[in-house]
Structures are given as C-alpha cells and as structure tokens.
Amino acid sequence: MEKGLKIVTIGGGSSYTPELMEGFIKRYNELPIKEIWLVDIEQGKEKVNIDAKMSQRMWDAAGYDVKVHVTFDRREALKDADFVTTQFRVGLLEARIKDERIPLSYGMLGQETNGAGGIFKAFRTIPVILDIVEDMKELCPNAWLINFTNPSGMVTEAVIKYGKWERCIGLCNVPTIAMMKEPIALNVDPNELIYQFVGLNHFHWHKVYDKDGNELTSKVIDAMLDGKDVGLPANINNVPFFGEQIREMNMIPCGYHRYYYRQQEMLEHSLMEYETIGTRGQQVKETENKLFELYKNPNLDHKPEELSKRGGAYYSDAACECINAIYNNKQTHMVVSTKNRGAIPELPEDSIVEVSCYIGAKGAMPVAWGKLPSAQRGWLQCMKAMEECTIEAAVTGNYGLALEAFTLNELIPSGENAKRVLDELLIAHKNYLPQFKSTIEKLEKENVTIKDSVVNEIIAHER
C-alpha cells in the first residue's frame, strides 16, 4: 500500500495557506496526502490556529481523509516529511513596514524585495532558512524544500550554496500570473502558447511563441502597451513601460522591472503613499486582518475571492504544481529558481537563476536561453553581484559587505544617506539580526537613531 505523503508548511499562519490547501485538494488524485503540518512561532499562534481550522474544514468539505496539525516545534513537524514548503516572514509584517518606511524617509525606494528592503529581508531570512536546512538533514534527509519565502532567489541560493542542500526549488508567482493573463489578452487558448523565461527572481524577461514556433512576443508587448492586463501583480503600481524601449528589446519584462525602467515614477508613487495612506506593508496589514476575519467564519470551507487581492496570489498553487511534478515525474514546464547550469552563459554555473525548467523526479532541469543582448546581460551581472554580496553578508554579518551590496543596488543612491539607511535598518531589526550583533552594539553606542516616527512606534510596541 502506498504511503500517504507528509507535507510541512513553515509559516503556516500565512494568509496564503487556504490557497495552498485548495491547490493540494485540486491535485489529491495525484498527490496522496495523509497529513499536513502547519508550523509557526508563538507570535503567530492566533493566525495559524485560524488557518488550521479553516484548512481542516476545506479538506473535510472535499471529502478527503487528511489531518491538519499545528505545531510551534519545527523539529516535531519535520520528522519524516516528504515535502517542506516555506512561506514565513521573519519579523512579521511589522518588519516589512520598517523595510519600506526607513528608506522612504530618506527619499529612497522602500519595497519588500527590491532596494534596501529586499536586502534586509534577505539578512533576516537567510540565517533562519539555513537552520531549517540543518534540521532537515537530520530529520527528513530525502525531503524536497519548496521555497516561496522572499526574496525567493537569494533564499534559494543560500540554501543550495551555503546550506549544501540540493533538493531545493524556489518559486515566484510573477511568471505564473503572466502565463495566466497573457493568453486572455491575446484571446487564445493557454495550451496553444509556449513560453521561455530568463533572468533572476523578480528580474526576468520572457518571450512567447505559438505551437508552430511563430513568435508572439510583439503581440503581447502591443497588448501590454494598449493597457491590457498581461499579469501585473496586485502590489505593483501600473506605470507604463516606454514602448520604444520594450519594442526594441523584443522581450517582455516582468512587473518588477518598473522599479528599474521607471524608477522616478515608482519612487514618486511610493513617496505619495508613504505620506498619505501608508506603505504597501501597512495596506497589506489591513487586508490580512480582513482576510483572517473571513477565515474565522465556521461555515467558510473554501478559499475566499478576496485573497486574490494580495500581491502574492497564486504562489501557493505554483508550489502545489511543483510538488506534483516532482512526485509524479511529470516533466512539467515551470519557471523556477534553480542552479544556472549554463542556461544563462554570462552567469556562473552555480548561480541561482529564474528560468524556464522542466520539473520531474530529479528536480528542475533548466532550459538554455543562450547569449543575452548587452543591456540584459549587464543588468543580470550587476544584479547577481549584488545578490552574492547580500547573501554572504547575511551569512557572515560583515558590515562592509552589506555596504557593498547597498552600493551595487540600482535602487539605492550611494553616499551618506545610503549608509544612514543601512545603519537605521540594522538598529530597527536588531532582534532578528544576530549575525550583526557587534555592529549594532557599535551603532547604538554612537547613538544612531531612527528618523521615521511610525517605525519608532513599532519598535516601542515590540519592547
């Protein structure tokens, strides 16, 4: 008799957990799941318990004999797991708000995965994911780690390079949304299109073809420039790309490229929100509160439509499909973060890239793109250098490397203010940055203070 699968979700109190359950329920005939463990920390106790009750209602309504467990002991959950998914946020949403508001208080972009905010999310997350990997080596050495904790590419690279854990795939919802929306914009069957993606997490481009091999990239570009929905995530302001630039490159940039191709306008929009309705993290906090009120309803046994308003919608469904592809050796085309292995010849073989892959029992097999045009090549090499410095600084706590990563980042103007933002973020996140302990103590002796009043209120409440 086939053994039922054990799935562990670290960060089980996420608002996306019902979407994860929906994805597993939809695939139950292919994935014989027996038990799901939702792991969280004490601060997330209320949310994970709400999620667990709703998840159990969803499974019961579907008529499947699957038991949902909750634990605050990660090691208890990991014992003999088959698949581990990660969707945790170190420091909770309050940390995201700090990541956004401190840079914006100095007129720099504050964003969850880009600029200074993205670097600090990596600093907080990488030590934790490496601890998880050490537990997995002992407790579930044959399990696959499916990561969709942001910044997904850097976290995945840390797992594979520093954690020495090869059975890891990083996921992102941005390619998934593009491949859902572009066929609608072109009024064609999704099964009639072939995609090829190349780049890094939240920094990739793609081309589109029909089944006869005819390129349709320019038609998607036309649809995008005409204002049609081609898959912009809900959390990104829809500033149009310059048509001349996009048509010349004949590659479809991802939504996050707006932060780089229209930096001025994206910064202006972020500053406007910062000064009025609050940053995206503050807005998401309100959205999450409403979602969890819905989840409390004892009669709710399906994913509510309101969840699609979150910027990370469809992450979870991608995770379920990835697990399905590995377990059943389906050789499914997906866009994931994995080892380069020559797919992008201008980057090192062991770099983690986000490219088209075929997913099966051996994991992800990347599809080679070949040489890139000068602009895309230059962007990727600079961004990868920034990522490598960020990851090494996250592991070592090296302040100079952290400053190097800031200097390399296109969204952080170098100079005194950049150093000030780095220092303030270190102080703001000191409870989650043990690797920077000596640096933070030095900054505190120098009386480094935080300018933003909202961040100061959050820190006071944390005490």
Locate each region found by the language model.
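Rossmann-fold dinucleotide-binding core
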Residues: 18, 144-213
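Rossmann-fold NAD(P)-binding glycine/threonine-rich loop
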Residues: 90, 94-162
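Redox-cofactor binding/interface segments in oxidoreductases and associated redox assembly factors
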Residues: 79, 85-86, 147
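Short, surface-exposed basic-aromatic patches at helix termini and helix-loop junctions that form
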Residues: 26-29, 56-60, 138, 157-168, ...
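Short acidic low-complexity segments
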Residues: 67-80
